[in-house]
UniProtKB/Swiss-Prot annotation:
Its EC number is 6.1.1.15. Keywords: Aminoacyl-tRNA synthetase, ATP-binding, Cytoplasm, Ligase, Nucleotide-binding, Protein biosynthesis. Consists of three domains: the N-terminal catalytic domain, the editing domain and the C-terminal anticodon-binding domain. GO terms for cellular component: cytosol. This is Proline--tRNA ligase. It is found in: Cytoplasm. GO terms for molecular function: aminoacyl-tRNA deacylase activity; ATP binding; proline-tRNA ligase activity. It catalyses: tRNA(Pro) + L-proline + ATP = L-prolyl-tRNA(Pro) + AMP + diphosphate. Belongs to the class-II aminoacyl-tRNA synthetase family. ProS type 1 subfamily.
Length: 572
């Protein structure tokens, strides 16, 4: 490809509305342009990267035995009503009616459509297992699209759905998809972790996320410094303290704390170690509970894990925090003065709180706290559960090493759905025993557009993108200096351009009438891995300057050797 026949569209300045580095660089490198909120046009450079990601995904899905299909983006509402998700999915589901007043949705996912297909096409256990995949546009009406294509409303996704007559068969395909995803992200040159995860709104049993490590990531991922253990922070178990609870050394005293409405204020004003404080959070109770609210207690320096809390049988789902008005109606005190002593509603404490002694907590009286509280002496030990987020340095749940926490960007997610959708849509086949058997399902997604952004978040420097070789828009950039004035520079550039293309190498030759500084800046911004610079001065010695984008290392290579050198560097 020649720049004179190409839409380069690079920008010198960073657009003001681009928050994260991937959004900034995708705009500056001429990869995307915003059409409307959460909607982007992919320009040639961006599309080349997107297609490379798509091709790797498709190859590995085919290698894993999945079968490609293509399903409509527009889906009839009755399928979503049949599955129960019409009411559950919320405003992210874009709903509309056609000219015949028939309701439809723009598909955010395709569980209903594929299950409908299978229930109409399959009839016998002999046809299973089958794993269908597509690479298709999705639409989710995000309340606040942000970070460019990282969280857009329209996006490209690879979604796969497998169907089985047994859990054992599902597990085999699940393991195959886990391995395929690991190969996909390894081939792309990404630093990633596969982590245990919550199943969320999709539902089902087992689940793993594939997270690309990046400082800008929205997810906290947890992994052992010794073993292979890794989990999303929502799911990571906080191990109970192994040391026995210390004996009480203080009497419980009621202390006036009129200006301490937060743990931070309490610690600062009374010079308390934060590890000796407890915070109390009130949430809505489950419908069958005798109380309207439940109190959840975590140590002052710990954070409540809302996913864990929501799974407690005493707690309403979805998790809903009580308003100050609701709290005062039950406790007669504000949120900053709550604690376990004389608490008139059910109390659940974290494992770490259960191991505390001589601690401070609200007295359930405005402007007052109890200091020196001890379990069983001052208040009976309530229900104990794991309800906090783990922190760095906690013991690993598998008993090997301690936990590290890093930020991650979710680029893939695999689920064991079980029979959630097949039961709702009555997808069944005749089993081996001749009886009707509801199918067991798996679901496997990769955010193809998100992978592009995540790769940039992990691969950039002050000059621009530093693409992993496998997904770079071009493999080689040829920069002929003053080619329009130097015949030998132009002649060699054309020769190398043809020879490299004949070797199957993707080349971008910058044949613009531009200053060298602009040419260098654009190629580094775009992130092409290999650059060769052809200039009269080096040609006097029969040399070409070669530069590897990732290391920045430059070297002089003889003109007769450069093609073989690049072929070896790229193809091995």
């Amino acid at each position: 490809m020649r720049t004179s026949q190409y839409l380069l569209s690079t920008l010198k300045e960073t657009p003001a509305d681009a928050e994260v580095i991937s959004h900034q660089l995708m705009l500056r490198a001429g990869m995307i342009r915003k059409l409307a909120s959460g909607l982007y046009t992919w320009l040639p450079t961006g599309l080349r990267v997107l297609k490379k990601v798509e091709n790797i995904v498709r190859e590995e899905m085919n290698n894993a035995g999945a079968i490609e299909v293509s399903m409509p983006v527009v889906q009839p509402a009755d399928l979503w009503q049949e599955s129960g998700r019409w009411e559950q999915y919320g405003p992210e589901l874009l709903r509309f009616v056609d000219r015949g007043e028939r309701p439809f949705v723009l598909g955010p996912t395709h569980e209903e459509v594929i299950t409908d297909l299978v229930r109409n096409e399959l009839s016998s256990y002999k046809q299973l297992p089958l794993n269908f995949f597509q690479i298709q546009t999705k639409f989710r009406d995000e309340v606040r699209p942000r970070f460019g294509v990282m969280r857009s409303r329209e996006f490209l996704m690879k979604d796969a759905y497998s169907f089985h007559t047994s859990q054992e068969s599902l597990q085999e395909t699940y393991d195959a998809m886990y391995a395929a995803y690991s190969r996909i992200f390894s081939r792309m040159g990404l630093d990633f972790r596969a982590v245990q995860a919550d199943t969320g709104s999709i539902g089902g049993n087992a689940s793993h996320e594939f997270q690309v490590l990046a400082q800008s990531g929205e997810d906290d991922i947890v992994f052992s410094d010794v073993s292979d253990y890794a989990a999303n922070i929502e799911l990571a178990e906080a191990i109970a303290p192994q040391t026995p609870r210390a004996a009480a050394t203080q009497e419980m005293t009621l202390v006036d704390t009129p200006n301490a409405k937060t743990i931070a204020e309490l610690v600062e004003q009374f010079n308390l170690p934060i590890e000796k404080t407890v915070k109390t959070l009130l949430v809505k109770a489950a419908k069958d509970s005798k109380s309207t609210l439940v109190a959840l207690l975590v140590r002052g320096d710990h954070e409540l894990n809302e996913v864990k809390a929501e799974k407690l049988p005493h707690v309403a789902s979805p998790l809903t925090f009580a308003t100050e008005e609701e709290i005062r109606a039950v406790i007669n005190a504000g949120p900053g003065s709550l604690g376990p002593v004389n608490m008139p509603i059910p109390v659940i404490i974290d494992r770490t709180v259960a191991a505390m002694s001589d601690f401070a907590a609200g007295a359930n009286i405005d402007g007052k706290h109890y200091f020196g509280i001890n379990w069983d002496r001052d208040v009976a030990t309530p229900v104990v559960a794991d309800i906090r987020n783990v922190v760095a340095g906690d013991p690993s749940p598998d008993g090997q090493g301690t936990l590290l926490i890093k930020r991650g960007i979710e680029v893939g997610h695999i689920f064991q759905l079980g029979t959630k959708y097949s039961e709702a849509l009555k997808a069944s086949v005749q089993g081996e025993d001749g009886r009707n058997q509801i199918l067991t399902m798996g679901c496997y997604g990769i955010g193809v557009t998100r992978v592009v952004a995540a790769a940039i978040e992990q691969n950039f420097d002050e000059r621009g993108i530093v693409w992993p070789d496998a997904i770079a828009p071009f493999q080689v950039a040829i920069l002929p200096m003053n080619m329009h004035k130097s015949f030998r520079v132009q002649e060699l550039a054309e020769k190398l351009y043809s020879e490299l293309r004949a070797q199957g190498i993707e080349v971008l030759m910058d044949d613009r009438k531009e200053r060298p500084g602009v040419m260098f800046a654009d190629m580094e911004l775009i992130g092409i891995p290999h650059t060769i610079v052809i200039g009269d001065r080096n040609l006097d010695n029969d040399d070409i300057e070669y530069k590897y984008r990732r290391s920045g290392k430059k070297s002089l290579i003889k003109t007769g050797d450069i093609v073989d050198y690049l072929v070896k560097a790229i193809k091995g």
